[in-house]
Amino acid sequence: VRSQRMKTELITNVSHDLKTPLTAITTYIELLEDDNLATEVRKEYLGVLKRKSERLKFLIEDLFEVSKASSGNVTLNLVEVDICNLMRQVYLEYEDRVEEADLIFRFRMPEEKVTLQLDSQKTYRIFENLYVNIIKYAMPHTRVYVNANKTKKGIVIELKNMSANELNIQPEELTERFVRGDSARNTEGSGLGLAIARSFAELQGGKLSVEIDWDLFKVVIVFQA
């Protein structure tokens, strides 16, 4: 029953997410057909068209990524990756957005370098998706904790934040396709971020799980050495 419900929700949500930018694009194209439009208004409409087109492009790319990952039809380029350094690099790319979201990140990493055989691009995407998810859904003016602990077999990474939304959802559902933490779907995004992150972790022999304790949201990633 749960599986059928999630399939129905998936179809409904993907239809909604594809239709919304397409409808906007069609509407603004029709508006641009007016020869009497002022230059400034025309520029404004073209700007909206560009943003909606990019939104549609990103959604389709995410669909393609998660489809490939689910089928296992992905080529991995395994190299030595300094996992903690990569996590910091991704954070620096999004530091401005973190400040805009009024969040404070706290990192606790091993003092020694932890290198693993990973696909650096796909591992970057894992943490990019996780940070973006936190920026979108974390409660403003709170701390985000990113902890990495080296083990005999590899590394365990935890990302913890307080959610701005009530999390009335099963943790495992959040890593399914098109499931979001905000049931009202008020934030932009494909709803595929956590699903892609989990798929890319699993493709590299790792694990990604979600834990929820009231409004505390935690993602745990395990990579083997």
Segments from the language model and where they lie:
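Conserved catalytic submotifs in the C-terminal HATPase_c
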Residues: N77-E80, E99, I104-V114
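A conserved beta-strand-to-alpha-helix junction within the catalytic ATP-binding
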Residues: N77-Y91
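Short helix-loop "hinge" at the ATP-lid/N-box region of the Bergerat-fold HATPase_c
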Residues: I134-I135
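Short conserved segment of the HATPase_c
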Residues: E166-V179
